[in-house]
Amino acid sequence: MDHRPGLDPSVAEVRRAVRSALERADGPVAVALSGGPDSLALAAATAFEAARAGIRAEAVVIDHGLQEGSDAVAAAAAEKARALGLGARVVRVEVGSTDGPEAAARAARYAGLAAAAVEIGADVVLLGHTLDDQAETVLLGLARGSGGLSLAGMPAERRDATGPIWVRPLLAVRRHTTVAACAAQGLDPWNDPHNADPAYSRVRVRNRVMPVLETELGPGVAEALARTAEQLREDAEAFQDMIDETIEDIVEHAEAGISISVAALAANPAAVRNRIVRYVVDSEFGVSLSRAQTLEIARLATDWKGQGPIDLPGCLARRVGARIEVVARTAS
């Protein structure tokens, strides 16, 4: 335990969280650094704990190029990492325009981090999301009418099929703790102006909605939302195991897509049926179905009245005899 005389409690809390995360590292680790208080506190704790454990750690600063002077901000963040004893690199990424600005920036950021991790030889990338970020994610999901999987928030650990392990050591740590940890160590974090821009829904939740909830419902709302996410994630993971087993039995590959047994799909409870539809379409085509689209496809099995093909982004769903086919639109 970090209870040495003079060690600030906030610094100790962040270090404990990082120490636990580093236990799963078999080699070098990368730490995502924006220069803000969350990622800077994470970088400082990683520098300390990695040195103690004999683990090489390197900070990766992503320059999205979306703000004037972003290159200088990125360079300053990298210099702070080096001052902490970390290796550091700046990765400039190109943000696409096909999705919304937040989604496009996120996709570019993760791609840049994954590529840097390969160059570093790191199987683990540490991310600085806090308990507050988790609570905001749950609230945003509720406002959008999302399903249980979205309300489960961000996982503490996730591995892509071909990428690194994404680890969020600070999901049980409050944002005010990372701010205090930076102050206690004399670190000067960068304050991203986007984090104060009410044009972003997450900023409105953070600065307007959460304070009202804390005032009206009492303290502990953020912690309660984070607990809800954790419980839903446990349920979702168990549910996904059921879905995987069912899919093996009822889903087959078809030309330019997949096909699903009508009888087997209809025999499942609605929750399982709808999850199967969403999951197989997302897995095959990368399309995230709305609830209305999901139900419309399911009705091809449960309420068949000769409906025509259902247009979806990049693909279409249709009833063909005793099966539902979801195929690329060019194959129709």
Identify what each model region corresponds to.
Residues 145, 176, 215-219, 271, ...:
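Residues at alpha-helix boundaries and the short loops/turns that link adjacent helices
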